[in-house]
């Protein structure tokens, strides 16, 4: 499959890096400490931590809970590995045609990318950089703007429902869901992983064998 666009915007966790075990553990501890009975972070992947914390504990406990989840996630940032195809694809891309738009705060996002041995883009969008996190379109609108493009010139790679909603709301040219988890989203196309995918600045080539849904 060939798709035409001028730039690529990547979510990080679940698309480029595998951090879910560390994320699940950190939020599990937070849930125990703050009495969040029955809470599972798996239902909220892709959501900015500060937004979720406020929703879960309210304003009175927000500062303590937000500081705690930041501490827990930062301490486990090195428990991160690259997902299939991420290393090869990112290292093949020239500067200025790709960036990462993560819901994580800047320090955490960069730490996970570094731990996975992946390159950092010249431009980078974290949850700290936008007024509204995913599923609002802000992260992808800003990512495209930093590269000098409209969102409609960009292809977005996402794994979580909140992120897919953000990309669609931003008006991305295509939204590619990554992993079987993305089959539950409204992504335009869903692929198994990034292995074998290539981009020359004009055309994205996806191996047919990697496509789970089109």
Put a short name on every predicted segment.
Residues 1-6, 104-214:
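Asp-based, Mg2+/Mn2+-dependent phosphohydrolase catalytic module
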Residues 2-94, 105-110, 118-119:
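N-terminal helical cap/lid subdomain that shapes the substrate entry/recognition surface
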Residues 18-19, 45, 100-101, 158, ...:
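Small/polar loops that bind or transfer phosphate-bearing groups
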Residues 97-99, 174:
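Proline-centered loop/turn at the N-terminus of a beta-strand
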Residues 15-16, 78, 98, 128-129, ...:
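A generic structural signal for short
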Residues 91-97, 148-151:
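Short, surface-exposed connector motifs at secondary-structure boundaries
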Residues 82, 101, 132:
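Residue-level marker of regulatory loop/turn positions in helix-turn-helix DNA-binding domains and
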């Amino acid at each position: 499959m060939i798709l035409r666009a001028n730039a690529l915007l990547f979510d990080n966790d679940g698309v480029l890096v595998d951090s879910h075990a560390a994320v699940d553990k950190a939020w599990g501890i937070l849930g125990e400490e703050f009495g969040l009975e029955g809470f599972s972070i798996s239902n909220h992947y892709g959501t900015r931590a500060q937004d979720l914390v406020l929703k879960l504990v309210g304003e009175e406990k927000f500062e303590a809970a937000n500081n705690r989840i930041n501490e827990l996630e930062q301490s486990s940032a090195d428990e991160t590995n690259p997902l299939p195809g991420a290393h090869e694809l990112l290292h093949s891309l020239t500067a200025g045609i790709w960036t990462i738009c993560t819901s994580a705060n800047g320090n955490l996002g960069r730490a996970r990318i570094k731990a996975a041995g992946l390159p950092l883009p010249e431009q980078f969008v974290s949850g700290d950089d936008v007024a509204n996190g995913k599923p609002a379109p802000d992260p992808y609108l800003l990512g495209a703007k930093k590269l000098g493009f409209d969102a409609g010139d960009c292809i977005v790679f996402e794994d979580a429902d909140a992120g897919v909603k953000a990309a669609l709301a931003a008006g991305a040219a295509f939204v590619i869901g990554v992993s079987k988890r993305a089959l539950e989203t409204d992504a335009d196309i869903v692929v198994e992983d990034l292995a074998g995918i290539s981009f020359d600045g004009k055309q994205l080539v996806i191996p047919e064998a990697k496509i789970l849904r089109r």
